[in-house]
Amino acid sequence: MAKMRPSVSLDTWREYFRRGDSDIFGIIDHAIMVAAADWPKEFKSRSDRIAELLFSCKVSRCIGCDHLELSIAGDEAAVEIVGVGGGGDRGDSGVATGEGEEASVSVDEVMRIRDILSNKDDEKDSVLLESLRKLESMSMSVDILKDTEIGKAVNGLRRHSSDKISKLAKTLFAEWKRLVDQWMNTPEEMAGTEGTPESLNLSVIDEEEAFPSPPHDLDIYAPEPNGFELSQILDCLDCDGNPRHSVESKHERKSQSSAGRRPKGTNDANVVGRYCNDQQTRREEADVRPMKHSATDVVEPKRQTKQSREQMVSAIQRKPTAVTEQKRKLAGPQQDKLKALDPDSKFEFAKRKLQESYHQHENAKRQRTIQVLETIPKQNKVQKPQLKRPATRRYIYWYFWSSEFPGYELPSLILNLANPRDSSSQFSRHDELMIDIPVYFGLVLVQIDKAEMVDEMMIFKKMSVLLTEKDFVDAIVSVSLKDLTRSLFVRFEAKACPKFDLIHKTSVETVRCVGKTFMHMLSKVSREFPPRNRTHPGGLLYQRFDPTHLSLARQQVAICKETDSQYPHEIVIHWTSASA
C-alpha cells in the first residue's frame, strides 16, 4: 500500500470535507459510485487498494496522553503513525508527521515500547497494558521483529500477575511466532531471493496461468537458509517461554548454519553427510554439557569438534566416489565379456540367471513353509480332581405355612410335601422347614453334602441362583448359619406372581395354586441339583411330587397358633442326618 504523501496531509482533507455540508460517509458512498461510473478501469484496478485501506486503518490512543493516532500499513509491512483529531468531525486536528520521520517512526516507537516493557518492575500495570495494546494495533514484520527484538520484552510478560497483561502478551507472542513460521516456510522465490534457472524457465512457461506451478527444484523449499536468520530474530521463542542462554543459542546457530547451508544441485552424499554431521554434533553436545571445566578446557574441545566435523564431512563425501569407482571397475570386465559373447551365449547366460533366481525363490518358499509347519508341542491335559463319595448326607425336609392373603382372611396352612410313606420308614427323625411367605410365592429345596464346606457364602450363592428367578424372588437379603449341624436361616424379599393376583377365595384353590408353583420351582431345582443315587429320597422327592399328592397334603392342613407377623419373610430350615 502506498504511503500518504506529506503534501496531502489529513488536515487539508479535513478542511476540504468540512467546507461541504454533506456527511462524510455520504461523500464516501457517492465518491465510490462516481469513480465506478466515470473511471471504470481505474476503479477496477484500484479496488483492491481501497479494500485494503478500509481494513488496515486502525486508531489507537497514545501512551501517556489522550491523543489518538492513526496506524496505516505500508507496502513493506511498515507502520506509519498519523495524527488524528480527537474531537470528531469538528474537533481539533492532530499533528501530521514530518517527511524525515515518516520512514523511521515505526521502529522508534517499537523501541520505545520495548524499553517500557523491559522495565516491567518499575512501570504500572496500566502503562504495560497500553503498550501491549499499541503493539497489537501495529502490523509487525519480520524485519521489525529482528531489529527491535521486541519478542524478548513481550515474552517476559507472559507470566505476569495480571491476567489481562499475560493474555495479551501470549496473544502477541503467538501471532508473531505464526508470522515467523510463515516466513520460514515461504520459498526463496516468494521471499525475494533469486531462483534457479529451472524455476525461471518454468515460470516463463506458466506465465499465462493465474498461479504458476511450483518448480521441481526441491532446494528452493528447504527452510535451512531462513533458519539462521530466524534464530537471530526471536531467540526467546521456545516452547516453555523461557529465554535461552546466549552461548547455547550461538553454538546451535553455528551448527545449524554449517549443516543447513548447501549449494544447489548437491548429491545424496552431501545430504547423508549433513545428517551424520548433525547427529555427531548432538551427541558431542550431550556429552560435553554435563561436564564442568575451566575456560581453557572448554575452548579446546570446540576446536577438536570443528576439526573432527570437517574430517567426517570430507570422508563421507569421499566414500560414495570410492564406492562408485569400485562398481565401475567390477562392471567393466563383465561388460567386456558380454560384448565378446555371441547372441546364443548371451541367451544362455540370461537363461541361467533366470533359473538361478527361480531356484532361490523356491528355496525361500520352502524355508518359509518349514518354519510355519513346525510341530506343536502337546499340551498336558489338566486332570480334574476326583471328589470322594461322601459317607453321610444331609437331606432337607420342608414344610411351610402361609401368611394372610391380602384382602382375605385365610387360615395358616401346614403342608407336608414329602411322601409320608418314605418319611416314616427310611428316616429316624425329621424336623420342620418353616417358610413364612405368602402362598403365591415359590419355594426351593437345597441338598447339602457333608463333603462340601458348608459356610454362609456357599449357601448364599446357591440360594441366589435358585431364588432370584423372574416372578418369584427379587433378591436375597441375608443368609446366616445359626448352627452348622441343625439350622439355616435365609432371609429374602419375595416378589408376587402377577398370575396369582387376588384370585384365591377358598383354601382348595389356594392349595392348587401352591402346587403349581411348587412344581415349577422343583423342576428348576432338580435341574440344578440332580439326584446322585435313585435309592436316596433326596432326588426321588422331586419326581414323586405331582398333583395327586395335593390330596395328601390337604389332609394335613392345620391351623397355625402362632401369628404370622412374628417372622415376616423368613425361612427356617432344619435338617437331619441319614446314613448313605
Curated annotation (Swiss-Prot):
Residues annotated as signal peptide: none
SUPFAM superfamilies from the UniProt entry: Conserved domain common to transcription factors TFIIS, elongin A, CRSP70
Ranges for domain TFIIS N-terminal: 108-183
Region annotation Disordered: where it falls in the sequence: 244-337
Main subcellular location of this protein, as a coarse class: nucleus
Composition bias, Basic and acidic residues: 244-255, 280-290, 299-309
Matching Pfam families: Med26 (PF08711)
Location(s), subcellular: Nucleus
Keywords: Coiled coil, Elongation factor, Nucleus, Protein biosynthesis, Transcription, Transcription regulation
PROSITE patterns per the UniProt record, alphabetical: TFIIS_N
InterPro entries according to UniProt: TFIIS/CRSP70_N_sub, TFIIS/LEDGF_dom_sf, TFIIS_N
Family: Belongs to the Mediator complex subunit 26 family.
Assembly and binders: Component of the Mediator complex.
Protein name: Probable mediator of RNA polymerase II transcription subunit 26a
Organism listed in the record: Arabidopsis thaliana
